[in-house]
A protein has these predicted regions:
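Short, conserved alpha-helical segments within structured domains
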Residues: 42-46, 68, 136
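Conserved GNAT-fold acetyl-CoA-binding loop/helix
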Residues: 34-56
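A generic alpha-helix propensity feature with a strong bias for hydrophobic helices
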Residues: 18, 45-47, 63, 104
Length: 182
């Protein structure tokens, strides 16, 4: 299934496009955004990092139908990218996101996660959503808790910041739909 446009009360989630790379390159390479990303992301972020990510990783995965990528934009400024969220068929890593620091702690990512999680379960018909995170990433944990996810595994993992305690969070379609209706 192609990545659809999604909308919440305050946000537009637009399917990622090649032309988004320029804006992403300008806002993404900030320590507060990258520190808890998996160690595979290049850091320091190269000048063509966003272009390579969008054109060599994200868009090909979207074309294959194994991942879905959106830019996050406020309705008040729909031309400005404030974050990114993706879903993937990758084992134990189904959802990832980042938000520009100045827009954090306003509920935007909770809102974006809610609509893409519903898409995962009720449009893509997946049975379970799993999201890994660094144990110290309290904001991400709060989003998972708010969504009704539960911690299912702990361990160590390499992040850009280094080797950190890591957690794997999960929610099933049945759990999601039960709480979403309730």
């Amino acid at each position: 299934m192609k990545t659809p446009k999604l909308e919440t009360s305050r946000l537009y989630l637009q399917p990622l496009q090649a032309e988004d790379a320029l804006q992403i390159q300008q806002v993404f390479p900030q320590w507060e955004i990258v520190r808890y990303l998996a160690a595979g992301f290049p850091w320091p972020f190269p000048q063509d990092g966003a272009s390579r990510y969008v054109n060599q990783i994200a868009l090909p995965a979207s074309e294959k139908g194994t991942a879905w990528y959106w830019t996050i934009r406020r309705k008040e400024e729909p031309a400005v990218i404030i974050g990114h969220i993706c879903l993937s068929d990758e084992q134990d890593n189904n959802r990832g996101f980042w938000l520009v620091p100045e827009w954090q702690r306003r509920g935007y990512m909770t809102e974006a996660c809610r609509i893409v999680t519903d898409f995962w379960f009720n449009s893509l018909n997946r049975e379970v959503l799993r999201a890994p995170k660094a144990s110290g990433n309290d904001a991400s944990k709060k989003i998972s808790l708010h969504a009704g996810m539960r911690l299912i595994q702990t361990g160590k993992k390499q992040y850009i910041e280094g080797e950190l305690d890591s957690e794997l969070w999960e929610i099933t379609r049945e759990e999601w739909n039960r709480q979403s209706r309730g």
